[in-house]
């Protein structure tokens, strides 16, 4: 999928509009400042480094984040209509977490996390369209998201912290104690982490369906069969090198 300059800018403007509509002051102003400061980098960031993943193209990150925000609003309403206790969750909480859940994919405040790959073989055979910046110290995406927010002085609640940290659900083993607890007191105190995880999964799945699913099997057309039977010349050479009488008899009957 490719986006032109107008589409890239329109998507970024949409992202900013969610901040202005749903986030409360003073975080609204802090987030607008942060996202305007890093606009030139974020606007071209992919959501993934491999073609087989979701939105692995320039502009894919903002495209994905916008989709997660929209899906999170849908999920929030679904949980409300289903009777969930949402008394401690606001739209500010929902949009803040959806907006920043993957912020760590940006990299550090100074360096990008990924660059377009120049390795033709890896691009064509492995679908690795981007390579990771090894100058950066390793952090998981959620941890780097949280680090960038605190570095920018943007605060959050305990529920928001847990939500961003665990948004990958059980795809990340580090989240197992949060999602597989048999002690009632250790379960999520609000469904906010579940709302964001659900929204992220749904957005990523739909993007994958639209972008990659139609390509599966397209390059696997049947190849012409190669005749691998022995001609008389090859058979004679093979028989002369075989010492086992049984194997020689088997080859002679091919």
Functional labels for PLM-detected ranges:
Residues 1-31, 52-54, 71-81, 192-254:
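Histidine-centered, transition-metal-coordinating active-site segments
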Residues 1-125:
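Acidic/His-rich, divalent-metal-binding segments that scaffold phosphate/diphosphate chemistry
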Residues 55-57, 63, 75, 87-215:
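Divalent metal-dependent catalytic cores for phosphoryl transfer on phosphate-bearing substrates
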